[in-house]
């Protein structure tokens, strides 16, 4: 199918500039031309871009999609208690079907707010892959690995990851990637982490892991290993493969140098870090070192939504107050975290993250005819400080229109709402879905 987005304002993310009255031609899944109208080119679908802004689809570089089932269940609790007293007991009762429906709900929410690519770590990842294939977005999936006492169980978890990779990596028209997902250095011991690293190297893929999210985690690492989590992971060799390091809140200057040296991509999750009182990641320091900082929501149970425009807004505002510097994390930098840097972190920078000829057509259209977006003085600032997720009008992934005029075309949204409500209540009551 050939598609034309006609007469649109375009922020390609290649430069800090919005172009007016641009035409974007898509052939199949690929952007073929950006610029003037081509009168001799036939297209199947024309999308009118008047009063809209086109930009790359947003990239949520760290989340736990199936946790939408636990949204608004346990709040105002520190991270360790939140996990051990509330979340992990519920997760022990999850079924594959629960995760399928919960993930599908999260994908619906992401589409509605302009996210076209995610990086997810959870359980029953085959179901997440099926939901991704069905709804039409792009995703990096990792089976969350937590070490247990039983060596056989630990071995099975590695085998599960290998099977997931063999079954789904590169599938769904290339929209799915598989990484290896050790939960954290405090839930996986050194020997097990080395086995996980060996698996990632053998598969030729990256690692997605939580790192230095809380002070407690860092203190326990220093007590147990005499090293920070970052230094511990470096010494184990984890950073020898491409690493998506979620959170990176409590870092020393030496840790930041390690992240730079090893080309690790930290993922900043401002709302989750605020809600769980985890602290403030040293984003400005990392950016000044040239580190590739991506942006994420974390899970919908610890945020409690998946609205990446909200994360962009927080990324561009929190750091100004934290550093007492109005120039800290300017609007375009915050937008880069959610597009260009996210693509680089997920090893997809050649395909997505910008709108340019030859890249995949992952494009969102923002409706600019909203009261909070008038007057149109500076659209880049508007995207960081004024746009709401609900302003997203159209979503295109891999050249296919999966939402138009805020109608999702690929799944029965009401059916998903019904299934999630039923399953969430059953889980909380301790019943089997």
UniProtKB/Swiss-Prot annotation:
It catalyses: S-adenosyl-L-homocysteine + H2O + H(+) = S-inosyl-L-homocysteine + NH4(+); S-methyl-5'-thioadenosine + H2O + H(+) = S-methyl-5'-thioinosine + NH4(+). Keywords: Hydrolase, Metal-binding, Zinc. Pfam families: Amidohydro_1 (PF01979). CDD domains: ATZ_TRZ_like (cd01298). PANTHER family: AMIDOHYDROLASE-RELATED DOMAIN-CONTAINING PROTEIN (PTHR43794:SF11), AMINOHYDROLASE SSNA-RELATED (PTHR43794). Catalyzes the deamination of 5-methylthioadenosine and S-adenosyl-L-homocysteine into 5-methylthioinosine and S-inosyl-L-homocysteine, respectively. Is also able to deaminate adenosine. This is 5-methylthioadenosine/S-adenosylhomocysteine deaminase. The gene is mtaD.
């Amino acid at each position: 199918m050939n598609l034309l987005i006609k007469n649109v304002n375009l922020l390609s993310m290649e430069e800090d500039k919005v172009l007016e009255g641009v035409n974007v031609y898509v052939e199949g899944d690929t952007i073929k031309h950006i610029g003037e109208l081509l009168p001799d080119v036939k297209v199947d679908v024309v999308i009118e871009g008047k009063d809209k802004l086109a930009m790359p689809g947003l990239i949520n570089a760290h989340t736990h999609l199936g946790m939408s089932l636990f949204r608004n269940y346990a709040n105002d609790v520190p991270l360790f208690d939140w996990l051990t007293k509330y979340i992990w007991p519920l997760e022990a009762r999850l079924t594959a079907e629960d995760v399928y429906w919960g993930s599908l709900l999260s994908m619906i929410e992401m589409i509605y707010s302009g996210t076209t690519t995610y990086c997810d770590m959870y359980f029953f990842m085959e179901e997440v892959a099926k939901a991704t294939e069905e709804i039409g977005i792009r995703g990096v999936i990792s089976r969350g690995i937590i070490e247990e006492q039983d060596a056989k169980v630990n071995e099975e978890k590695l085998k599960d990851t290998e099977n997931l990779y063999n079954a789904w990596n590169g599938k769904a028209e290339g929209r799915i990637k598989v990484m290896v997902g050790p939960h954290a250095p405090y839930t996986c011991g050194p020997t097990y982490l080395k086995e996980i690293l060996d698996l990632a190297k053998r598969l030729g893929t990256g690692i997605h892991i939580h790192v230095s999210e809380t002070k407690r985690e860092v203190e326990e690492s220093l007590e147990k290993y005499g090293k920070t989590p970052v230094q511990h992971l470096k010494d184990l060799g984890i950073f020898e493969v491409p690493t998506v390091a979620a959170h990176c809140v409590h870092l020393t200057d030496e840790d930041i140098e390690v992240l730079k040296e090893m080309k690790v991509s930290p993922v900043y999750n401002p709302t989750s870090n605020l809600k769980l009182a985890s602290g403030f990641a040293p984003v400005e320091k990392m950016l000044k070192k040239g580190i590739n900082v991506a942006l994420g929501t974390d899970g919908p149970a610890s945020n409690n939504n998946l609205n990446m425009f909200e994360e962009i807004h927080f990324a561009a505002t929190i750091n100004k107050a934290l550093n007492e510097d109005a120039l800290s994390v300017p609007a375009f930098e915050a937008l880069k975290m959610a597009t260009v840097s996210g693509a680089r972190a997920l090893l997809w920078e050649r395909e997505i993250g910008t709108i340019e000829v030859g890249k995949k057509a992952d494009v969102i259209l923002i409706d600019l005819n909203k009261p909070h977006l008038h007057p149109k003085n500076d659209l880049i600032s508007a995207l960081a400080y004024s746009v709401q997720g609900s302003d997203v009008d159209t979503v295109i992934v891999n050249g296919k229109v999966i939402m138009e005029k805020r109608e999702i075309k690929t799944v029965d949204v009401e059916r998903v709402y019904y299934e999630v409500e039923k399953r969430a209540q059953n889980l909380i009551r301790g019943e089997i879905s």
